[in-house]
Amino acid sequence: MKILFATSEAHPLIKTGGLADVSGSLPDAYYHLKHKVRMVLPAYGDVWEKVSDVKQLSELSIGACGRKLHVRIHAASAEGIDIPIWLVDIPELFHRPGNPYLALDGKDWWDNGERFAVFSKVVAEIAMNRAGLKWQPDLVQSNDWQTGLVPALLTLESVRPKTVFTIHNMAYAGLFPKSLFEGLELPWKWWEPDRGIEFYNNMSMLKAGIQMADRVTTVSPSYAKEITFPEYAYGLEGVLIRRLDEGHLIGILNGIDQDLWNPKTDPFIDHHYSADKGRVVAKKRNKKEMLDFWDLPKSVIDSDDPVVGLVGRLVPQKGIDLVLDVLPELIEQTNARFIMVGTGDSLFEYHLTELAHQYPQRVMIYIGYSESLAHKVEAGADLFLMPSRFEPCGLNQLYSLAYGTPPIVHSTGGLSDTVVNATKENLVAGKATGFVFYDPSRHALKSTILHALHLFSKKRTWQKLQKNGMQQDFSWTRSAKQYLALFKAIV
């Protein structure tokens, strides 16, 4: 099968969030399963220094907002990506400082709607083999609002590739004024709320993808159900319920990059291990090296007392307020230590830093993000804390399972789909992989942490729990096979 994967970011070329991680791994997994794949993304200024073997393939003109834009399409390759990359080069839209969506002052680029609408038009031309590339896909997979117009534009063609639109985060709807809709000369039949892309007198590029793709996917089965409820749908529950009822909204779990996140080979840790070899000793050694980062006394570093780690954004969505509520009591009532790595709301940063000053041998804080430290925490902590209020898929709990660090998670989205709660029944059945609480409250979080710390003292049970998690398959190959089964059903 020939697959065109359209995205606004891809690791390691350009990254602002989880979409880049998916784009950097999933298309490669299709390729390794013997499919012909091309990835297309905008040629941002920062991308040029990360690609090699650049060759111009074609030129074309795209009309939008009363002007004609000259477009060059380049082929390129990049370390870490195995498939051909097609860069859509429109200097006046994409050669800018800042990140793909924000100017240097942190505000959205004023013309983001035009930028990504034009990019989507180019993708549609490529898909229809009208871009001078002499290649036409059987299927186009587009991602989030930035490429939401691609499936819509392709519905205007009598014979076309099939389309799959993947939602990574419903929070970003790609809302733009009616004047952009008019400037793009889109069909007026689309300017209505039920089957079109109008949303409270704006156009929504996210809604365009949801309405008009042949199939809609999102990044976990539970999130696919959750986004049909108002609290997760941001006003789009009507169209999402319809797509779900049609059988056209499907959740497929993300995978993890096992070249980057693998305790057998991780370059950021000194003591490697696997589910069956060296796990107990290596985890203890990695724990000591992790604690040594904070220059703690030797007696604290050498202690077997449990360490609970957290790596993530310090924002309400991630449940950090719940963590702050329960930490003082847990410090008083248990022997656990807590390591927090992240950045976010200044108030959360302040309160966590205050706790670290108050309990310097029990609470260790790193404000910021460090790739090296994130790996060390996954390998060195005994438990990983992820109390997110909502989480479309989540990656850190998958890393934790892979590293034998049982996660404590709130039952939402991908967290529900990936962590098997350590109930009596699941422990007896040998299925448990972590700890789940079902109400995002301080009481539920605290009691779950206490349950986890109790099980930590039962070494045989704990080692079985670790091993169960490490034996789960969260590879991109597994994810890709599920996507490909969907693709084959509609092509």
Where do the protein language model's features map onto the residues?
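Catalytic cores of nucleotide-sugar-dependent glycosyltransferases that transfer UDP/GDP/TDP-activated
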Residues: 1-491
